[in-house]
UniProtKB/Swiss-Prot annotation:
Membrane-spanning residues: none
Molecular function, one GO term: naringenin-chalcone synthase activity
Protein name: Chalcone synthase 2
UniProt-listed Gene3D superfamilies: 3.40.47.10
Alphabetical list of InterPro entries matching this protein: Chalcone/stilbene_synt_C (IPR012328), Chalcone/stilbene_synt_N (IPR001099), Chalcone/stilbene_synthase_AS (IPR018088), Polyketide_synthase_type-III (IPR011141), Thiolase-like (IPR016039)
Organism field: Citrus sinensis
Recorded name of the encoding gene: CHS2
Family: Belongs to the thiolase-like superfamily. Chalcone/stilbene synthases family.
GO terms classed as biological process: flavonoid biosynthetic process
């Protein structure tokens, strides 16, 4: 008869959790950032607020965003005038949209990831679904299981209302699942739609306007598993270690509240300052075991909360301009897609590394870091190891 320890040992994987495929998706409708202030103030019937519109234009100009994708079209907004007001009861209308569209967009990303992985979906043992867009029972995890046709016995984890740090959280959870369940293949999906946060402007709530200038829609999916079968699976990144921390003196720095008016967004403190002041501590703790202290010697995937965060992190750590190139590229092309962003950046980096004939998936470097920043202020840190690119 097997002992508990023998059973335990048999359940564990031998190697580290590894990203085996990545897929991304966006709604069909996109907006150009340069034209967005005119469109936004027109659709919300706020054109009389000329000073506020000028402020919003400056926010959009400084955002370093060229384009964003949005499920909400002019037609949908005209049918739902309460969503265009600043604080009108509109949660039902928002929920009706997101409970359908969040799993649908997630399915698009997941289908691409499964196709790249190349294995039957019946081999998926666990599903992690993450969204800050709407809440329902049974959740988006259940809806996605049905939409894709996963096994009814797939083990599901639903993460709601985590916000912008959650791209790190899902990888942390996927790592623990893959390494503690031999043969596990974890499908991770982050799907975000701004229909829950879109609202008209108010000169009493400028931080809400910041959100209107930055947030975009997108979904990303990854497959994570340990001990890949390299005859049929292609490793992309190894997840080496993970941590989560709440930054000191950051209570209320970023808040979101789900109300009758939808999800409201509040920035109460100097978020870029708080992150840049504390980031070196997180890096030092994560990389001390590896003897790494030169932050230019690793590849970087940082949640692009906004350009000011990236600028201050770059300056504080003395990072070379190219270090945040993939991060800035995703911000420019998609805006801030909350939890999905870092997975889009992983995808961007592995593709560019191949295009530019780099030696590894990490821009030719071996070690890298993935950061999620969000409400709390919470920071997720993931240490990544790249994989050699075979010519």
């Amino acid at each position: 008869m097997a002992t508990v320890q023998e059973i335990r040992n048999a359940q564990r994987a031998d190697g580290p959790a590894t990203v085996l495929a990545i897929g991304t998706a966006t709604p069909a409708h996109s907006v150009n950032q340069a034209d967005y202030p005119d469109y936004y103030f027109r659709i919300t019937k706020s054109e009389h607020m000329t000073e506020l519109k000028e402020k919003f234009k400056r926010m959009c100009d400084k955002s370093m965003i060229k384009k964003r994708y949005m499920y909400l079209t002019e037609e949908i907004l005209k049918e739902n005038p309460n969503m265009c007001a600043y604080m009108a009861p509109s949660l039902d209308a928002r929920q009706d949209i997101v409970v359908v569209e969040v799993p649908k967009l997630g399915k698009e990303a997941a289908t691409k990831a499964i196709k790249e992985w190349g294995q039957p979906k019946s081999k998926i043992t666990h599903l992690i679904f993450c969204t800050t867009s709407g809440v329902d029972m049974p959740g988006a995890d259940y809806q996605l299981t049905k939409l894709i046709g996963l096994r009814p016995s797939v083990k599901r984890f639903m993460m709601y209302q985590q916000g912008c740090f959650a791209g790190g959280t899902v990888l942390r959870l996927a790592k623990d699942l893959a390494e503690n369940n031999k043969g596990a293949r974890v499908l991770v999906v982050c799907s975000e739609i701004t229909a829950v946060t879109f609202r008209g402007p108010a000169d009493t709530h400028l931080d809400s306007l910041v959100g209107q200038a930055l947030f975009g829609d997108g979904a990303a999916a990854v497959i994570v598993g340990a001990d890949p079968d390299t005859s049929v699976e292609r490793p992309l990144y190894q997840l080496v270690s993970t941590s989560q921390t709440i930054l000191p003196d950051s209570d209320g720095a970023i808040d979101g509240h789900l109300r009758e008016v939808g999800l409201t967004f509040h920035l109460l403190k100097d978020v870029p300052g708080l992150i840049s002041k504390n980031i070196e501590k997180s890096l030092s703790e994560a990389f001390a075991p590896l003897g790494i202290s030169d932050w230019n010697s690793i590849f970087w995937i940082a949640h692009p909360g906004g350009p000011a965060i990236l600028d201050q992190v770059e300056s504080k750590l003395g990072l070379k301009g190219e270090k945040l190139k993939a991060t800035r590229q995703v911000l420019s092309e998609y805006g801030n897609m909350s939890s999905a962003c870092v997975l889009f950046i992983l995808d961007e980096m592995r593709k560019k590394s191949v295009e530019e004939a780099k030696a590894t998936t990490g821009e030719g470097l071996d070690w890298g870091v993935l950061f999620g920043f969000g409400p709390g202020l919470t920071v997720e840190t993931v240490v990544l190891h790249s994989v050699p690119i075979k010519a």
